[in-house]
Amino acid sequence: MDLLMRSDKLKNVHSDIRGPVFVEATRMRKEGIDVLRLNTGNPATFGFEMPDSVRNALINNADKAVPYCDLKGMPEARESICSYHKGKGFKDITPEDVFIGNGVSELVTMALTTLLNYGDEILVPSPDYSLWTNSVYIAGAKPVHYICDEQANWYPDLDDIKSKITPKTRAIVLINPNNPTGALYPRELLEKLVQIARENNLVIFSDEIYDRLVMDELEHVSTATLAPDLLVITMNGLSKSHIICGFRCGWMVLSGAKEAAKDFAAGLVQLCAMRLCANALPQLVIPAALADPESTRAMIVPGGRLYEQREATCRELDKIEGITYVKNSAAFYIFPKLDIKKFNITDDQQFAMDYLHSKHVMIIPGRGFSWNEPDHFRIVMLPKPEVLAKAMRDLGDFLSDYWQQV
């Protein structure tokens, strides 16, 4: 038989989080080399534990997950999600506006597949979380990347966004809090972004999965609360805030111009029906998890692990000549900048590979986040503070005489 080749729809799809550097690190680990994995946001692998509220809800209700559930998700779970978002200021939403999925990843792909036609364009941030760019490609559309400005706390560049809107632009993606930068967008900025969407009749996708991991007593503002006249699709879930990445527990909420989006919503129902239902077991913990904000808050205040891990990382980064960064306000990521002239860096993947081979620490190069210059990389700040501090000291030692060989 002829060779079977992958679809052209996958031509531009990439996942550097589990890309070449990950593959090489996996090979090294199989050979018995201890590799510190700062590549993926998977808290449980670094000693974080799910809250007792989640564990007890799972154990006490497991039998309820045996049959298929509603194709949009269990009613009790959708009711608790609806109440959570109403508490954040959402107006005129009901449990029928909530769709539960096998993680936000599944829902992003479903929503973009439902919305986009071949040739459509959608505005996606650069840097971004690659799921968004990849899902646009899989839907047959074109991601158009707008710049988030490092000199302005990694906030979206409004002029750049305006310059990239065309008659083919259907929607804009906002990742707030942001992955990979850890930026948190203030209300005033969100109002301006919403106004751009309003003036250009754009759907807004607002990825807010890190909204419960905001530090320094800052406020997270949900985009939907500022756009009651627009269709806003808000993505959220429990993977990070409640340490259950493997459960694949995410949801999306449709708000605003729902009347105009009836056919779109019907399309989402079609795709939900195709997979019968999302995994029922993790849905059982949603009400208990959302009723237990303190278990998350304990991690993000002074003395909490996420807070102290950030502080340890930044203290050591401050000591490295040739690296600058913007301190994250949320989540557990930071996206430092390298002085590429100082280190002769032309290939960020090669830099990450060299660091891996030298110090046995795995990071993800900026290219994995739709960043076109070879001058950034993402650090996942999940190991304990002393481990992160050593990794950053190792980075400084590595860079002290680094000169990339071309």
Placement of each model-derived feature along the sequence:
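N-terminal small-domain helix-loop-helix segment of the aminotransferase-like
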Residues: D2-G103, M110, A289-D292, D401-V406
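Generic structural signal for small/hydrophobic residues in well-ordered secondary structure
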Residues: V21, L38, L58, I81, ...
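Helix C-cap/helix->beta junction micro-motif
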Residues: E31, A139, E199-N200, L230, ...
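Conserved core segment of the aminotransferase class I/II
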Residues: R55, P228-G304, C314-E316, L399
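PLP-dependent enzyme catalytic core of the Aspartate aminotransferase-like
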Residues: G87, K162-S163, N344-T346, D354-I363, ...
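Conserved PLP-anchoring active-site segment centered on the Schiff-base-forming lysine
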Residues: T114-V136
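Active-site phosphate-binding strand-loop segment of PLP-dependent enzymes
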Residues: V144, D149-H220
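Conserved glycine-rich beta-strand-loop-beta hairpin in the small C-terminal domain of fold type I
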Residues: P287, G303-C314, Y325-D339, E373
